[in-house]
Amino acid sequence: MATVSMRDMLKAGVHFGHQTRYWNPKMKPFIFGARNKVHIINLEKTVPMFNEALAELAKIGNKKGKVLFVGTKRAASEAVKEAAINSDQYYVNNRWLGGMLTNFKTVRQSIKRLKEYEVQAQDGTFEQITKKEALMRTRSMEKLEKSLGGIKNMNGLPDALFVIDADHEHIAVKEANNLGIPVFAVVDTNSNPDGVDYIIPGNDDAIRAIQLYLNAAADSVKSGRNQDVAAAVAEKDGFVEAE
């Protein structure tokens, strides 16, 4: 299972919060102090909290659970997609569509349409219809791919959300809360930690910090799954130790 040290966090700038005038008082327990009117996050709190979150993600991976990585702002978008793909999970990195979780039935219909367009693009259907119609379908397919491409193979609601910037993704957090889906989230000094089950107090803007969170989370989910695979192989080969 992945773990992250204080040195790793310092190098990535996890400890730099937002300007003091933008703070959310609910983040006070996680703030060490201020320097040049910028809040400094207490990494002595962040390190154990993040490692606890990673241990839980490994358990979800071990149970073959589904983790949905969410980060739609520019600094997080590409890293969110990479983390999800690397861990064979799911992502939303463009725009959170209202009802993506709470109205998943309707979202499923859009995913079905996306998959139909993908088949048509491959099987020659687009060549048999008018150029105008083919162009309209291509544009519709690209738009759907942008919004839903990261969840088109999710087949049901996720078992957890891993969110970069709880404040920016507050709609996703609220939908998960309504459905009882656990939320793991990076929460900066300007954000509200309410509704987050596993709070990771930290910088949610620096690309290096974002990559640190996502790489560790993806590695934890993967290691949980691999443990399960290793156990299955050992059992098959007769190497299970007697208790």
Swiss-Prot record:
GO biological process, one term: translation
Family: Belongs to the universal ribosomal protein uS2 family.
The name this protein goes by in its record: Small ribosomal subunit protein uS2
Source domain of life: Bacteria
UniProt keyword annotations, A-Z: Ribonucleoprotein, Ribosomal protein
Organism of this sequence: Aliivibrio salmonicida (strain LFI1238) (Vibrio salmonicida (strain LFI1238))
Pfam name, any one: Ribosomal_S2
Molecular function GO labels: structural constituent of ribosome
Stored InterPro entries: Ribosomal_uS2 (IPR001865), Ribosomal_uS2_bac/mit/plastid (IPR005706), Ribosomal_uS2_CS (IPR018130), Ribosomal_uS2_flav_dom_sf (IPR023591)
Originating gene: rpsB
Cellular-component GO terms for this entry: cytosolic small ribosomal subunit
Stored NCBIfam families: rpsB_bact
PANTHER family linked: 30S RIBOSOMAL PROTEIN S2 PROKARYOTIC AND ORGANELLAR, SMALL RIBOSOMAL SUBUNIT PROTEIN US2M
